From Swiss-Prot:
SMART domains per record: AP2
Taxonomic placement: Eukaryota, Viridiplantae, Streptophyta, Embryophyta, Tracheophyta
Keyword terms, alphabetized: Developmental protein, DNA-binding, Nucleus, Transcription, Transcription regulation
Result of altering residue 81 to L: In fzp-2; absence of floret formation and replacement by excessive ramification of rachis-branches
Domain of life: Eukaryota
Localization in the cell: Nucleus
Any one GO molecular function term: DNA-binding transcription factor activity
Name this protein carries in UniProt: Ethylene-responsive transcription factor FZP
Region Disordered, annotated ranges: 1-59, 158-178
Gene Ontology biological process terms in this record: floral meristem determinacy; positive regulation of DNA-templated transcription; regulation of secondary shoot formation
Length: 318
């Protein structure tokens, strides 16, 4: 009895399993998975791969909290950041960055926009400050007409209009019809006036003559007045011997007039001394000292010539 029960149970279970197998849908054949490469398993590093540029953002442009956009660029050689300015829109800041990048790296620069080959002819970024030879090279082919003519100075484009906006406002009147974003590196040429040039040459000659007049050579440093002041200033031109004789006569008349005034002063001094001592004793004392008691300058000169005693006014007689 037990064998029949066990056989019936096993047959029923097998029949149920077969029914379940027919009821299940057939499984598709599995395809072999491709072998995984070792590069895909490694996570990408931030230094090796550059971060993808987000839409709406530009290289070298940052947005300020108050709504303006700042542009700056980093020098690849010195690793220094150069400030390009703040702008109202992100496109203007991106243009300023592109011009600075083209000035630094040329065709190898990464820019925000696509440019033609003509845009690569910008001067170096720091040319106006560190390389004056670029300005001299630009001035060589320029043609300038002097004497009232007007010369056309070449213009070299800068890397940004807003980077030196105060320079553009300052040179606006001089440049005239210069385009936006360009600045002139040529100096302003002033036409030469022939009359002013002759005046300047005459002033230069006067300056040189004055220098020769004040600072003479080493061989003329004798110490006399003639080595400092020319003889033409000391002696008037023309006249010859007659002029010299007239000058000597003028000097002798002046000396005689001075001696007369000095003798009158001596007479006044004698009278003052006589009044101070008083009486006849004064005359004796004046006679002993060599002063005449009366008679004026003539008696004093006569007494001084006739007496052997010392007189302090004896030099007046010579």
């Amino acid at each position: 009895m037990n064998t029949r029960g066990s056989g019936s149970s096993s047959s029923s279970s097998s029949s149920q399993a077969s029914l379940m197998a027919f009821s299940e849908p057939p499984k598709p054949a599995s395809q072999p998975s491709p072998p995984s490469s070792p590069m895909s398993e490694r996570p990408p590093s931030g230094r090796s791969r550059r971060r993808a540029q987000e839409p709406g953002r530009f290289l070298g442009v940052r947005r300020r909290p108050w709504g303006r956009y700042a542009a700056e660029i980093r020098d690849p050689t010195t690793k220094e950041r150069h400030w390009l300015g703040t702008f109202d829109t992100a496109q203007e800041a991106a243009l300023a960055y592109d011009r600075a990048a083209l000035s630094m790296k040329g065709a190898q620069a990464r820019t925000n926009f696509v440019y033609t080959h003509a845009a690569y002819n910008y001067p170096p970024f720091l040319a106006p400050f560190h390389a004056p030879q670029y300005a001299a090279a630009a001035a060589a082919p320029s043609s300038v007409q002097y004497g009232g003519g007007v010369g056309a100075a070449p213009h070299i484009g800068s890397y940004g209009h807003h980077h030196h906006h105060h320079h553009h406002h300052g040179h606006g009147a001089a440049s005239g019809a210069s385009s936006v974003g360009e600045c002139s590196t040529m100096p302003v040429m002033v036409p030469v006036d022939p009359h002013r040039s002759s005046m300047s040459s005459s002033l230069l000659d006067m300056d040189r003559n004055g220098h020769d007049f004040l600072f003479s050579g080493a061989d003329d440093n004798s110490g006399y007045l003639s080595s400092v002041v020319p003889e033409s200033c000391l002696r008037p031109r023309g006249g010859g011997a007659a002029a010299d004789h007239q000058d000597m006569r003028r000097y002798s008349d002046a000396d005689a007039y001075g001696m007369m005034g000095l003798r009158e002063d001596v007479d006044d001094l004698a009278q003052m001394v006589a009044g101070f001592w008083g009486g006849g004793d004064a005359a004796d004392q004046l006679g002993a000292c060599g002063f005449p008691a009366s008679g004026g300058a003539a008696d004093m000169v006569a007494s001084s010539q006739g007496s052997d005693s010392y007189s302090p006014f004896s030099f007046l007689s010579h």
